[in-house]
């Protein structure tokens, strides 16, 4: 079972209210009056309980407010406690605008957790040639706080009415460049991240920085040219991230870049069996160019492991736990064959018939990738790790829920999550 399950739940819940999963039959009216939208706010809260070996018996609650003061804005809160003493809290605010015609969208996320007897891969245990039993079991406090200021560029389909263009759940593809089609944006995200082990934890030697907290700025450049945000069948999505942490008395400067590229091809129907077939392909690669830079005062200009380039988790190498592999650089490939069966019985099933479930999807997927201590294309394509699996996904009240099983060299993992992985 995924050792960091609750952190994944928090992140997934945040995605639930993001711009990418507005209900396809519920477009955002950003020009509605604040008074009417506030009175029509959608509020929901869900208690949950689960048990795993690492977490113990866990209980919590998550709540969401859509149209929170503005028609396109949302709020999310989540928290849990366990019988082992672990606790987690999460609070997020998304898509707030200065005015309906503004090109800026603002948000914030605040996550804190105190974890007891958790599995961590640090030092050599996080390298590509490591083994699963090299983990340590430790207590740690973790945090990730960040603000977001997203500017929607006046090109492509966002030349006019930028917020609607960015948040509308579907769009017509009108070209193959950012100037012709899709929505392009720049997102500035100042952040603070920390992982503090208890004082009696014996940590192995590591090639990374040893500071237990870091702050800096993440800048995202994104071009979204998907035909639909919830379940794309055509187009592409490109995201390039630059993360920089400055020199301070408590940390050394470092920077890294990440490129995440996805494509989608509509393969059409298959007789009376499948209403839709889609082949989706994703490439992710990243590097830390400051890795070998050094000076007498600070040593090597490298991030701490928890802020480094990682593989494993919800989106890449899905048969491994989150952050299983960490290095200077990484490359990862994912392929999915997604089909929508013509047979759709969910509306007649117990529990499902309480909700609007317009479609479901069957998926076969495969991932390969690895981390390395240099950005060497040949090395990054040797001794690659792999994952393969299957998934069933369905849209519930406008939200894509994915249940998937992944197998790999070390273990198999079953997950329930929201949103497409790419």
Residue ranges and their predicted role:
Residues 24-107, 116-118, 183-201, 206-233, ...:
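Outer-membrane beta-barrel initiation region
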Residues 26, 31, 50, 111, ...:
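Transmembrane beta-strand segments of outer-membrane beta-barrel domains in Gram-negative
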Residues 42-51, 61-63, 72-81, 236-246, ...:
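Transmembrane beta-strand segments that form the barrel wall of outer-membrane beta-barrel proteins
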Residues 47, 61-65, 91-95, 147-153, ...:
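Residues on the lipid-exposed face of transmembrane beta-strands in outer-membrane beta-barrel proteins
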Residues 79-154, 272-314, 324, 379, ...:
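Outer-membrane beta-barrel translocator/channel fold
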Residues 217-352:
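C-terminal outer-membrane beta-barrel translocator/porin domains of Gram-negative envelope proteins
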């Amino acid at each position: 079972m995924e050792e960091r399950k609750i952190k994944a739940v928090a992140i997934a819940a945040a995605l639930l209210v993001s711009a990418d999963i507005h209900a396809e039959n519920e477009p955002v009216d950003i020009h509605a009056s604040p008074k009417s939208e506030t009175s029509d706010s959608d509020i929901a809260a869900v208690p949950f309980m689960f048990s795993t070996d690492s977490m113990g018996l866990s209980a919590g609650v998550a709540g969401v407010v859509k149209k929170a003061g503005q028609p396109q804005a949302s709020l999310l809160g989540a928290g849990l406690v366990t019988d082992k003493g672990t606790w987690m809290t999460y609070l997020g605010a998304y898509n707030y605008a200065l005015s309906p015609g503004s090109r800026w969208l603002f948000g914030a996320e605040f996550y804190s957790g105190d974890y007891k007897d958790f599995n961590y891969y640090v030092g050599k245990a996080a390298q590509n040639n490591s083994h699963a039993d090299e983990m340590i079991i430790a207590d740690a406090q973790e945090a990730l706080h960040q603000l977001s200021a997203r500017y929607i560029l006046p090109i492509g389909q966002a030349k006019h009415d930028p917020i609607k263009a960015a948040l509308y759940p579907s769009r017509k593809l009108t070209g193959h460049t950012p100037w012709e089609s899709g929505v392009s944006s720049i997102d500035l995200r100042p952040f603070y991240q920390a992982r503090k082990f208890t004082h009696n934890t014996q940590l192995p030697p590591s090639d990374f920085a040893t500071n237990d907290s870091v702050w800096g700025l993440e800048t995202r450049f994104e071009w979204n040219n998907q035909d639909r945000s919830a379940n794309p069948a055509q187009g592409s999505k490109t995201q390039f991230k630059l993360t920089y942490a400055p020199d301070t008395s408590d940390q050394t400067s470092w920077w890294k870049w990440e490129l995440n590229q996805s494509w989608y091809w509509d393969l059409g129907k298959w007789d009376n069996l499948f209403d839709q077939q889609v082949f989706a392909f994703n490439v992710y690669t990243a590097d830390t160019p400051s890795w070998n830079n050094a000076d007498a005062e600070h040593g090597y200009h490298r991030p701490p492991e928890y802020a480094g380039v990682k593989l494993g988790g919800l989106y890449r190498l899905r048969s491994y736990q989150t952050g299983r592999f960490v290095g200077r650089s990484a490359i990862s490939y994912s392929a999915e064959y997604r089909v929508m069966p013509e047979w759709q019985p969910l509306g007649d099933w117990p529990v499902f018939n309480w909700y609007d479930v317009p479609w479901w999807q069957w998926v076969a997927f495969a991932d390969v990738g690895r981390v390395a201590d240099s950005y060497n294309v040949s090395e990054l394509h040797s001794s690659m790790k792999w994952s393969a699996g299957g998934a069933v996904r369905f849209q519930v009240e406008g939200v894509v829920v994915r249940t998937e099983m992944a197998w790999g060299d070390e273990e198999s993992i079953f997950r329930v999550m929201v949103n497409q992985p790419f």
